[in-house]
């Protein structure tokens, strides 16, 4: 009803002006939320948020089906609101609602000819955490060339400045820390990035301290399964069992919420710079578009000055710039 009211108001303006100057298009936004504490037993992570997103995705799916009929029989449906829909997005704070939560919704809507965008890499416990979230968004949401990634600050901020501002100590929940360390180890192998010895020892100590005997490769495989519906996990492999525990083992989940003090060594800073560079190469090669929102990032305190914005790393006319990523400049202030 709200959309219909807005549509009628805009059409009224157009009729009064005898024009179509008040043009608009619709992008539906899923909203990331922190899961409320529930007394329910046997519920997966983000259970209530997932249920809400599923309901919303179902409603959008029905509307997009109508949109397809609009496009096919335009003369019969002229002015129908569904023909204004051009994209799907997910926004808001991402610390407690990772890309995996939206995987089924994006998959269900992927058959329609619309654009997809996902705000990611803006809120993070560590740059590595933000980079992992970007990687998961691309993988779990099956993003294609031309789809958009919102903000992606973790992809381009300067690690030395970031870590010095945090006094080289980061407070990170244990589950997030383990996942970040495993992701860094596996990506360094994939991208042929050398891990400094002290950093590698730190990674392995963190993983071995949490391990119940599984290999890191099995754990990483379980991380990649997080795009799958947690209600239909099964026990096909060791990775599936690890994924099942991730959702339904109460002791593991409780331990994962404990905040750890992560020490940032000088070698870690340079290592993260190398990982950032490799990921930027990946984004550039696959031609994802980065939505940059400088005024928003400075206004809400992510960055102190405009000249610190990573857009100058993503796409710069300066000599020596190694990247030319597709970017758009947006406000994001409204």
What is each residue range found by the language model?
Residues 23-27, 84-89, 115-117, 146-150, ...:
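Structural preference for beta-strand elements that scaffold enzyme active sites
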Residues 117-125, 148-152, 295, 323-334:
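Short acidic/histidine-rich active-site segments
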Residues 60-88, 133-151, 312-329:
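Structural recognition of alpha->loop->beta junctions
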Residues 1-100:
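Metal-coordinating catalytic core of metallo-dependent amide/deamination hydrolases
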Residues 182-184, 208-234, 238, 304-334:
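Flexible, acidic glycine-rich loops studded with aromatic residues
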Residues 98, 102, 125-137, 157-168, ...:
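Histidine/acidic-residue-rich catalytic or RNA/ligand-binding cores of hydrolases
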């Amino acid at each position: 009803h709200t959309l219909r009211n807005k549509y009628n108001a805009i059409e009224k303006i157009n009729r009064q002006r005898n024009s179509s100057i008040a043009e608009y298009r619709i992008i539906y936004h899923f909203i990331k939320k922190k899961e409320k504490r529930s007394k329910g037993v046997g519920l997966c992570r983000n259970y209530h948020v997932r249920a809400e997103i599923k309901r919303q995705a179902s409603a959008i799916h029905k509307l997009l089906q109508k949109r397809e009929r609009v496009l096919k029989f335009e003369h019969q449906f002229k002015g129908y609101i569904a023909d204004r829909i051009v994209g799907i997005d997910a926004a808001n704070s991402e610390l407690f609602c990772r890309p995996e939560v939206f995987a089924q919704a994006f998959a269900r809507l992927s058959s329609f000819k619309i654009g997809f965008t996902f705000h990611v890499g803006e809120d993070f416990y560590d740059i590595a955490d933000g980079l992992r979230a970007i990687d998961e968004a691309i993988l779990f949401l099956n993003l294609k060339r031309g789809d958009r990634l919102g903000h992606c600050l973790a992809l381009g901020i300067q690690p030395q400045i970031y870590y010095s501002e945090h006094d080289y100590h980061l407070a990170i929940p244990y589950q997030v820390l383990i996942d970040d360390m495993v992701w860094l180890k596996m990506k360094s192998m994939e991208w042929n990035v050398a891990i400094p010895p002290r950093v590698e020892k730190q990674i392995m100590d963190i993983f071995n301290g949490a391990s119940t005997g599984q290999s890191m490769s099995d754990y990483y495989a379980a991380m990649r399964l997080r795009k799958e519906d947690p209600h239909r996990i099964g026990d096909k492999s060791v990775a599936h069992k690890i994924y099942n525990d991730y959702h339904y083992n109460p002791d593991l989940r409780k331990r994962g919420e404990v905040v750890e003090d992560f020490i940032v060594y000088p070698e870690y800073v340079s290592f993260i710079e190398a990982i950032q560079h490799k990921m930027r190469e990946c984004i550039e090669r696959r031609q994802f578009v980065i939505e940059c929102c400088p005024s928003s990032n400075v206004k809400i305190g992510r960055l102190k000055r405009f000249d610190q914005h990573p857009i100058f790393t993503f796409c710069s006319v300066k000599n020596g710039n190694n990247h030319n990523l597709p970017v758009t400049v947006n406000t994001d202030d409204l």
